[in-house]
Amino acid sequence: MQKNTGPALPGDRPIRRAFLKASGLALTGSQVSGLSLLSGIAQSKHVRASEAGAGRPSGRAKSVILFNLLGGPSQLDMFDMKPSAPVEVRGEFSSIQTSLPGLRICEHMPKIARLMHKATLIRTVTHGYNSHNPLNIMTGWSLGNPAALRPDPNDPPDIGAVCQYFGMGPDDMPGAVCLPCYPGWGESSMYPGIRRPGPYGGSLGSQYDPLFALCDPTFDRKPDRPYYGTAIALGEPKLPGAETVPGLTVDRLKLQRSLLLQMDSEFRRVATSKSLTRLDKLKDMAFLLLSAGKIRSAFDLSREPEELRLKYGGSLFGNCMLVARRLVEAGVPFISVHAENFLPNGSFTYDMHENNFAMLKDHNLPVLDTVLPALVEDLEQRGLLDSTLIYVMGEMGRSPKINAKAGRDHWPQCGFCLMIGGGIAPGAVYGETDATAAYPKSDPVSPADIVATIYKQLGIDAHTMIPDRAGRPMPIAHGGQPIPGIT
């Protein structure tokens, strides 16, 4: 394997930066927040796959969709109900029988109940990373700084970055896409500058970041106050493009790209090809984003029948799932959809320290019970479910004991993961918890095991080593093992 390359030669970036500024293509940080990376240039993909030591991986799953239930969904109120537990533990909800004999889940997820014979439910996800960052569920690494509100370049790369490192996916599409925005964007009014660690290239470099979509949600009503009457986010994820950069057009960008390519030929006389791969990737991203019809088409929901759009529910997250399906059709290997906190306007997170039951009943569970079955049915009807692995989980579970504000608090000791498609065994329940769903009773599963299982389905050996920033070998699944019996 090759070391991660160092910075470009000292003299080249200032020259190119000056050119970009003069030509009007010097974008500010706010203008490129959704343009973080599009690493799907054909030649570089083939080079990366070659440098990684083999051809592109090929497994049962060709694409993975993560639905990150940001905040920490309650295992006790969703998929691991304990009707015999004391009232201060079991909560207000009743259970219903699912399509999988012997399995009962929350009464407020009737559509999901009807598809459980197609899924594997893992009830014993456990770790010690008490944080709302999706770092652990996207990388398998649970030793990060739980207080971090921005990614660290030394963080391990997520699944999408590893897919890109191995050159997966078509040459004219990004290797990973993050919807509806980077995690933390909706919280920026409370925590300026927040970008929750997780969906990044990390130690592989920012060139392996996903393409971050943009969003500007509206809400179905004005919320009263947080945790009491929060509104549902509406709208669609948007592809960054010319509209995000004032005065930038495709024709103008093509001219600038032509000039930059001429400059690149001069740089090649004094720099190695590895250095050039790190030279202002923005120019390639912007060109591809603005001119490639395939990726723009994937974000164009007007191409979908109204009847199908209604099945997804019309919320921002329903539309994210529909875009995710379109990205799967286009061959994108890794798509992550993140519940987001848009306070004070609205929220779709599971961090319910207050009013847990009303929020779940009236807000979160109806949305989840709409968008997930719609996605599964849509993929299945198109013959894509067997090659698309969906995993649904949050970064932790919730505390068994209900607090004085009718909420549940953080509880990383026990949570769940739901897996569907992509060669995962249908109709399975893995692991058993104790009487209050506080701790695993058998078969504990770490986030690293979840990630290792996903790599296996993608055709990537979970024990593969890739270089960190210092060129030292680093395991992609951080010691995780594929979960036995579900693949």
Residue map of PLM features:
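Ligand-binding pockets and gating/stacking loops
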Residues: 2-487
